[in-house]
Amino acid sequence: MIESFAPIYDKNCRVLILGSCPSVQSLAKGEYYGNRQNRFWRVMFRLLGEEYSDDYSVKTGMLLRHGVALWDTIGSCARQGSLDSAIKDVRPNDVAALIRDGGVRCVALNGGKAKAVFRQQVDADVVFLPSTSPANARMDFETLFSVWQKALSPYLY
């Protein structure tokens, strides 16, 4: 069974971005979006107006400084490889419990599997975003960034 990471969260977060489940590369590195081909970190650095860094503590610190939390919809599952289509035996994370007493106003779902697993259980706006995964190669970076920027800007600034 694959176990998700602990959330990156504090009570000042206004946006919670939910993925599905860590990839093989992410699990090996012990980091969210650890596959260098995944565009999540490039999107977030640009969206938040910060200079890109490969340092994971810089990445997570940037999110929290800007009121962005990060977690997965799936708490544990079985999966061969990294593709979301191979996920089975899902136990969802309790998103409502995480943000019950915080200031999250928007839950953003990164990709189709996150959307499929998530159950509207929170008092917040919910937005569906195209996946930053390399499996979503049909969407170029500029288009992907534009969609994310349009959806999240009202909650970040």
Question: Where would I find each of the regions flagged by the language model?
Answer:
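C-terminal capping/extension of enzyme domains
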Residues: 3-14, 35-36, 81-96, 116-157
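Hydrophobic/aromatic beta-strand patches that form the interior of the parallel beta-sheet core
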Residues: 16, 69-71, 108, 127
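Proline-aspartate-enriched helix->loop->beta-strand connector
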Residues: 95, 99-109
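Short, well-ordered beta-to-alpha junction loops that form the rim of enzyme active sites
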Residues: 20, 109-113
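Short, surface-exposed acidic-centric catalytic microdomains
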Residues: 25-86
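Short, hydrophobic/glycine-enriched beta-strand segments
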Residues: 14-20
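Short loop/turn segments at strand-loop or loop-helix junctions that form parts
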Residues: 20, 73-75, 130-131
